[in-house]
Design a protein with these regions (language model features):
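Conserved, mostly hydrophobic/aromatic
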Residues: 4, 8, 39, 100
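Active-site pocket-lining/capping segments in soluble small-molecule metabolic enzymes
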Residues: 32-89, 106, 120-127
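Catalytic beta/alpha-barrel core
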Residues: 10-19, 101-104
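Active-site-adjacent beta->alpha loops and helix N-cap segments on the catalytic face
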Residues: 16-32, 107-118
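A structural motif corresponding to the C-terminal end of an alpha-helix
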Residues: 7, 88-99
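Aromatic/hydrophobic pocket-lining residues that form the small-molecule binding cavity
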Residues: 1, 23, 82, 86, ...
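A short, amphipathic alpha-helical segment
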Residues: 94, 113-124
């Protein structure tokens, strides 16, 4: 990361993160680089989605507790719970993150738009 900063990087972004503690640990390890670290936020949409990310995508961990929350969920119920999990992540990292990198799952842009509205509401609370 330091090499990227030396070559002009103005921010860094992560893969989707589902554990706030992991992001905060990464932030602590990279905090002296002088650029914002933006966590990837991709709402889960189903149990299958959570399991796939956890088991098949290197570098992405979906904690046991979150996989348990997604158990048996799909379609609208899965998307609702995935948004709730994403909001909780944003709440837990809001004061530390340099912003967020929102990733709409499967082209479901409406989920990212809901998170944008949520983030803007959080920002207004601080004013």
């Amino acid at each position: 990361l330091r090499k990227k900063v030396a070559n002009g990087a103005r921010f860094a972004q992560t893969q989707p993160v589902y554990d706030p503690a992991l992001f905060l640990e990464a932030l602590e390890q990279t905090g002296d680089c002088g650029i914002p670290l933006l966590p990837g936020v991709m709402p889960l949409v189903s149990e299958r989605n959570a399991l796939y990310l956890h088991n098949e995508v290197p570098g992405i961990t979906v904690p046991d507790a979150i996989r348990a929350r997604m158990k048996g969920l799909e379609k609208e119920a899965g998307a609702r719970e995935g948004l709730a999990i994403a909001r909780e992540f944003i709440d837990a990292t809001f004061n530390a993150a340099g912003g967020y990198y929102l990733i709409p799952p499967f082209g479901k842009c409406e989920l990212a738009l809901e998170l944008i509205d949520y983030i803007h509401a959080r920002e207004r609370e601080l004013r």
